[in-house]
Amino acid sequence: MALPKDMRLKGHRTFNYIHKNSITYHGKLMTFKVARSNPGILLTHKLKNTSNKFRVAIAISKKVSKKAVERNKLRRILQEWLLTNIQKINNHKPYWLLVNLKFGDFCNDKSKLLEEFQNLMFKSRLIK
């Protein structure tokens, strides 16, 4: 299941803001870029609710897999984990998260991917 629209990041200005103003956390399989939210950037996208909410973008390069089916499967796995483990209580945190997967052969190892994702979520203090 996909992330709800109010949890997604979109737009090139948003990503430029994250790249310039973020703290980066590195793992073996992925990197996290966490930045304080800036709802003013999202006003151009005509979003009704641009409050300071936790928002996420998952970027998977073609270096990870040439097949879009596999990249989308990885994205869905991470989004499903987020939906089940980020409660509405944590949704008030005013942070934006960009997840970049590094290249590697972990398409078949879902547990390794989720373990690293969870470790980086704890490391970045987005969940407790």
UniProtKB/Swiss-Prot annotation:
Pfam families: Ribonuclease_P (PF00825). GO terms for molecular function: 3'-tRNA processing endoribonuclease activity; ribonuclease P activity; tRNA binding. It is an enzyme of class 3 (hydrolase). Its EC number is 3.1.26.5. SUPFAM superfamilies: Ribosomal protein S5 domain 2-like. One of its GO terms (biological process) is tRNA 5'-leader removal. InterPro entries: Ribosomal_Su5_D2-typ_SF, Ribsml_uS5_D2-typ_fold_subgr, RNase_P. It catalyses: Endonucleolytic cleavage of RNA, removing 5'-extranucleotides from tRNA precursor. GO terms for cellular component: ribonuclease P complex. It comes from the Bacteria. Disulfide bonds: none annotated. Coiled coil: none annotated. Keywords: Endonuclease, Hydrolase, Nuclease, RNA-binding, tRNA processing. RNaseP catalyzes the removal of the 5'-leader sequence from pre-tRNA to produce the mature 5'-terminus. It can also cleave other RNA substrates such as 4.5S RNA. The protein component plays an auxiliary but essential role in vivo by binding to the 5'-leader sequence and broadening the substrate specificity of the ribozyme. Belongs to the RnpA family. This is Ribonuclease P protein component. It comes from Prochlorococcus marinus (strain MIT 9301).
